[in-house]
A protein has these predicted regions:
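Extended beta-strand/beta-hairpin segments
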Residues: 1-56, 64-159
Length: 159
């Protein structure tokens, strides 16, 4: 059980702890593991960088919202979500500005496709304004607390 406080505005069934663990594989190369056992690598070669993962999180989070709502009406012929941003360094430090999420979605002709096209703008807006946890966290902002835990040292400390 986590001691992390839950946001007051969420009922307990809507508040859930999320976590990943990053392990260093080599200088500039890391493996991230989620609680379900999924893994991915990140680093400075062909792997995703942390900034690219943030952008992928924005695209993925909103795309899931949009896909679930529109695919109930028609299976898309094309479904692409692109995210772009400018990385800057200023008096506030390194950060991204001017984030833009663009959806390119095509549906078949016919009643289902027409229905999906009709709800698409509203679903994109709802995802942006309320549903996508990733982009909402960025837009609303939340503190990030960095903690250093003591790690065992010496040759006998590694199992």
């Amino acid at each position: 059980m986590s001691s992390t406080p839950r946001p007051a505005e969420l009922p307990p069934e809507k508040s859930a702890h999320r976590s990943v663990s990053l392990t260093r594989d080599a200088l500039g190369h890391y493996t991230v593991t989620n609680a379900r056992g999924g893994t991915m690598t990140l680093g400075d070669d062909a792997d995703f960088t942390p900034v690219e993962l943030l952008l992928a999180g924005i695209a993925g989070c909103s795309a899931i919202d949009v896909d679930y709502f529109t695919s109930r009406r028609a299976e898309p012929l094309e479904f692409v979500a692109d995210v772009e941003a400018e990385k800057i360094a200023d008096e506030q430090g390194n950060r991204l500005t001017d984030l833009v999420l663009t959806f390119r979605v095509a549906f078949p002709e016919g009643e289902g496709g027409d229905a999906a096209r009709a709800v698409l703008p509203d679903i994109v807006k709802r995802s942006h304004d309320r549903l996508c946890t990733v982009s909402r966290t960025i837009e609303v902002g939340t503190p990030v607390t960095a903690v250093v835990e003591s790690a065992p040292t010496g040759p006998d400390s590694i199992a």
